[in-house]
């Protein structure tokens, strides 16, 4: 299979290297030059998009994750079978999919007629991510998803739990995305407002992707454009 790799954390982020390892060091990288977390489905249409080659099959794009998908499937790797975005440092569950550049990259792929997977790693602060573990479980997830039916205009959204040594091995669970809002809270300093919503305090509807992931399992949802 031919893989196109992208993300929203940037081409130098450890997550895309972990993704590459999970795919057996296969695939073409077309990823943002800079960090674009939370950019949503923004695309560049009114100015040039600069691209810098970073060695064989690696391209750093001065644009958004959705720009990277467009350039990748149209110009750099039109023979791609799967577009895969991640591994994102932070969860992309429930309504996060509207905000996430990672999810936007694969939504764009689905719009353009390609199979796609977004994969993210929830961060249970103050823990840090074990990228070797993330790569191991990403590989297991992919081997499951290759066998699943994926209708046109649909894509997979995967969220890894924050596992640490001593925790039970996670199960792979297909589930529904949460529809609950993110916590919205701000602190005020003068005329400045600072977002202070606590991600880990999100509502946990039983069986939702948030509940599955926060419970220590791998949450997989099938989303549509």
Swiss-Prot record:
InterPro entries linked: SurE, SurE-like_Pase/nucleotidase, SurE-like_sf
A molecular function (GO) term: 5'-nucleotidase activity
Superkingdom as given in the UniProt entry: Bacteria
Protein name (database record): Putative 5'-nucleotidase alr3139
Note describing how the cofactor binds: Binds 1 divalent metal cation per subunit.
Catalytic activity: a ribonucleoside 5'-phosphate + H2O = a ribonucleoside + phosphate
Binding site residues for a divalent metal cation: 8-9, 37, 88
Keywords per UniProt: Cytoplasm, Hydrolase, Metal-binding, Nucleotide-binding
Species this chain originates from: Synechocystis sp. (strain ATCC 27184 / PCC 6803 / Kazusa)
Similarity-based family: Belongs to the SurE nucleotidase family.
Location in the cell: Cytoplasm
Pfam families to which the protein is assigned, alphabetical: SurE (PF01975)
